[in-house]
Structure formats: structure tokens, C-alpha cells
UniProtKB/Swiss-Prot annotation:
Belongs to the long (4 C-C) scorpion toxin superfamily. Sodium channel inhibitor family. Beta subfamily. GO terms for biological process: defense response. Residues 1-19 form the signal peptide. This is Toxin Cll5c. Its main location: secreted. Gene3D superfamilies: Knottin, scorpion toxin-like (3.30.30.10). The keyword Mitochondrion does not apply. The keyword Disulfide bond applies. Coiled coil: none annotated. Residues 20-85 form the LCN-type CS-alpha/beta domain.
Amino acid sequence: MNSLLMITACLVLFGTVWAKEGYLVNKSTGCKYGCFWLGKNENCDMECKAKNQGGSYGYCYSFACWCEGLPDSTPTYPLPNKSCSKK
């Protein structure tokens, strides 16, 4: 029983340690989600935790939303074969 608990704890730890992080990206433009209030930022945190993103925490870093705890399925900046096209 103790072995099962240890294995479960290790799997949870690996999931937390190996979780994806990066800048949130707009899939249609290829640009990062921008922000102005550096550090703790409610908008970035809300965007990162949104159902379609699945992150655990977000904050403003270098004037863009940085997310932690993202699932592998969530795209982050830069997108392959797509550069940021500001028009």
C-alpha cells in the first residue's frame, strides 16, 4: 500500500514539474497576448486559467502573458510556421 502511495505521489510531482510553460499565443495572428502591468496580472492569470488554455497560473513578463502549468496541447509562442503578423 505504501508503494502505491509513493508511486502516485511521484506521478503527481512529475506532472507538476514537467508541466509546460510559455507565452500565450493568439492562434490566428501568431502574436503573444500583450499586457502592461508587469508581475502579478489578473488579466494574464484569467487568460491562462481559461478552459481553452488550461494553465495553473499566469503573470505579465516582458509585456506579454506568461503561463505556467499548461497542458501540452496548448500552443505557446512562437507557433511553428507562423510569425506574428501585426496589421
